[in-house]
């Protein structure tokens, strides 16, 4: 819990910007899964994850993007997952609702 308010704000802003971009790109109908955005829930995810250690494991529900990113999940892997690519965090099989990052200790 060493982050400044400014750092926490920028983490929340990053998540919001990612979510807004996903919402924009989803209309192109190239993403292979329904998406469940976390817009409006960024502060909860960032606040909780601020108090966790790298070794802590968390699970989230179907609106997992914010928690995944706040816990340190890889953005490129998450986006690849939404597009159903084998390079996705669940090898393109989990979609938006089933994100996984073992290195970050995250499951949804």
Kindly give the residue locations of the regions a language model identified.
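Charged, compositionally biased N-terminal leader segments and the immediate start
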Residues: 1-8
């Amino acid at each position: 819990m060493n982050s400044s308010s400014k750092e926490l704000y920028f983490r929340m802003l990053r998540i919001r910007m990612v979510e807004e971009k996903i919402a924009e790109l989803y209309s192109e109908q190239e993403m292979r899964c329904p998406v469940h955005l976390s817009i409006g829930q960024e502060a909860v995810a960032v606040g909780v994850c601020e108090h966790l250690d790298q070794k802590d494991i968390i699970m989230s529900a179907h609106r997992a993007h914010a928690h995944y990113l706040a816990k340190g999940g890889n953005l490129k892997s998450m986006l690849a997952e939404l597009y159903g690519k084998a390079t996705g965090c669940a090898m393109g099989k989990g979609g938006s609702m089933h994100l996984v990052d073992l290195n970050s200790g995250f499951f949804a």
